[in-house]
Amino acid sequence: MTLEFKLSEEEIELLPTDEDVAFYNEHGWYLSKKLLTDDETDELVNASERYYAGERDRTLPTAPPKLAYWDPTKGNVQRHNDYVHYEHDGLAKILRKPLIGAVAARLAQTHEIRIFQSTLIYKPPVEGEPSNIVPWHFDKHYWSSSNSDKMLTAFIPFHDCPPEMGTITMVDGSHRWKEIGSDDTVVRHFADRDRSQLDQMLAENASYNGAEVVKLPITIPRGHMNFHHCRTYHGSGANVSDRPRRAISLHLQDGDNRYREFPLSDGTTAAYNHDALVRRTSDGRPDYADPEYCPTLWADR
């Protein structure tokens, strides 16, 4: 089956320029133009509320071991729900807008973009809530079973997202750092790590590279989104506003990304939640191009 992806003349004007791509390559992040209409961001809010109320178009056939999946029994903490592009068609309809994939393809300098994961996030306006603080990390640590270094994430707030709402914060240029050693505890999710340990890791890696830690909270206007490289350190602070911060982290893979065996020091291999869900390739490996879970968002061939 051949998929056709096309942009309107208006959408083509919204693609990153050569200067934007150069900025992304140097800094490891890029704040987009307005890619979603106000109607689309309104629909993201409405669809997310239906999702939180229990609406699903389909459910995962099994719960992978590291699945993030908030439900009301967990209380008024920061909510993370994975695979919303699979489970909820209302959210998927907007997340699968070809323009998002085309922007990502320009930044990653690739011809094809597939969804890797989508996580619905709700950060409540609760002063002092510890789960609202996201410590420093970069995504590729959790994607060690992927062989690509072109992967990237679109952080998509459903509203204007200023620093007081706990917007995403980039460590500028950190995607170009070399890592210290091979401490493979980094493959554990930040929710399972000590925050001070992650702060120390950031400082040590910066020092190793002779770099300064430059933390940039990104003010994101409604309808815009912030793209970051899979090796860019990032985190987010408290929501000290009077309203919830609603967003989706849309994780994206280039068309060449494949599963790889990544041995860990404890004798196991790195795994990702897809490994329990996706079909297998002819040689028995998890297929990160399975269209059920990793649909193509953009292809320009």
What are these regions (language model features)?
Residues 108, 139-151, 213, 220, ...:
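A short beta-loop-beta micro-motif enriched in histidine and acidic residues
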Residues 1-26, 33-136, 142-145, 263, ...:
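Non-heme Fe(II)-dependent double-stranded beta-helix
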Residues 2-9, 54, 61, 65-66, ...:
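Non-heme Fe(II)/2-oxoglutarate
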Residues 111, 140, 145, 156-167, ...:
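Active-site region of the double-stranded beta-helix
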Residues 127, 132-136, 146, 164-170, ...:
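A short secondary-structure junction signal
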